[in-house]
C-alpha cells in the first residue's frame, strides 16, 4: 500500500511540474510574441523616418503614425513615456470600448491587450482623453505607472508624449492617485471627459490634487487639455491607478 501511495505521489508531482512548466512556457511565449509585435510596429515607424529623411521630407511622429494606420484603422495614436516600457499604439473602437482589452494590434487574442482610448472620447475635441492599459506584473503595458507612486520617479519622468494622426502632443503630469471603482463616494474620473465649463474643470483638477500621492506644483489652466492614463491597482479590490497630465503648448 505504501508503495502504491508513493508511486501516486510521484505521478502527481510529475503532472504538477508538467502543468506548471506548460503555463510558464505559455506565458513566456505570449510575452515574446507581444513584444515582437510592438517591435515590428516600431520598425515600421523607423523605416518611414529613414525614407522621409532620405527624401528631405518632414519626419514628425504623427506622420509615422499615419503609416501604422494603414495596418489597422482602429489606431488613434501612440503613447510614449521616455525611459520606460510605455511605448505603445493606442486604439479606439466606438461600438465596443473594451475590444482591445484582450486583443493585440492585429486583433488576435492577447492577455496583454493593447492600450485603448475611452469610446466616449473624441480625439480632436475632448478636453480629457482617457487611455486604459493593463497593469502587467512584469512591468509591461501600463505596469510601470506603479512607479509614479514614488515622487522621485515622477521627477525624472514628468512628461507623456502622445502622437495622434494629426499632431505630436506633449503633456506634463500634475497628479498621480489611486481610487476605487463601483462605490458611490469615490472619484469617478472615468466619467469626466468634457470640461468646457471652467467650474467643472477646476473641480476636476482640485479633486486630482486632493487625491494625489504628492504635490507636483503643476497648476493646469482652464482650456489646457488633459490626458489620463488609467490602469489596475492591486492594493485593494477594484482599485485603479491614475496618472493625469496637462497639455504643454508653446513651452
Q: Predicted segments — roles?
A:
Residues 1-4:
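Positively charged n-region of N-terminal signal peptides that target proteins for export
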Residues 6-22:
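Hydrophobic membrane-insertion alpha-helices, especially the h-region
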Residues 20-251:
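Solvent-exposed, non-transmembrane regions of membrane-associated and secreted proteins
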Amino acid at each position: 500500500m505504501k508503495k502504491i501511495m508513493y508511486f501516486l505521489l510521484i505521478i502527481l508531482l510529475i503532472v504538477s511540474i508538467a502543468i506548471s512548466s506548460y503555463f510558464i512556457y505559455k506565458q513566456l511565449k505570449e510575452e515574446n510574441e507581444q513584444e515582437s509585435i510592438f517591435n515590428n510596429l516600431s520598425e515600421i515607424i523607423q523605416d518611414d523616418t529613414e525614407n522621409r529623411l532620405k527624401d528631405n521630407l518632414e519626419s514628425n511622429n504623427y506622420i509615422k503614425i499615419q503609416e501604422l494606420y494603414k495596418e489597422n484603422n482602429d489606431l488613434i495614436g501612440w503613447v510614449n513615456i521616455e525611459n520606460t516600457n510605455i511605448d505603445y499604439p493606442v486604439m479606439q473602437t466606438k461600438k465596443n470600448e473594451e475590444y482591445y482589452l484582450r486583443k493585440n494590434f492585429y486583433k488576435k487574442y492577447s492577455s496583454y491587450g493593447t492600450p485603448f482610448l475611452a469610446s466616449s472620447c473624441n480625439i480632436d475635441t475632448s478636453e480629457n482623453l482617457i487611455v486604459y492599459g493593463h497593469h502587467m506584473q512584469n512591468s509591461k503595458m501600463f505596469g510601470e505607472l506603479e512607479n509614479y507612486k514614488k515622487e522621485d520617479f515622477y521627477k525624472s519622468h514628468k512628461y507623456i508624449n502622445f502622437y495622434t494622426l494629426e499632431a505630436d502632443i506633449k503633456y506634463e503630469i500634475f497628479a498621480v492617485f489611486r481610487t476605487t471603482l463601483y462605490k458611490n463616494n469615490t472619484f469617478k474620473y472615468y466619467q469626466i471627459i468634457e470640461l468646457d465649463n471652467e467650474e467643472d474643470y477646476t473641480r476636476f483638477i482640485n479633486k486630482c490634487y486632493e487625491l494625489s500621492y504628492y504635490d507636483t506644483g503643476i497648476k493646469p489652466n482652464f482650456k489646457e487639455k488633459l490626458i489620463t492614463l488609467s490602469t489596475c491597482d492591486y492594493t485593494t479590490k477594484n482599485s485603479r491607478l491614475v496618472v493625469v497630465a496637462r497639455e504643454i503648448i508653446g513651452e
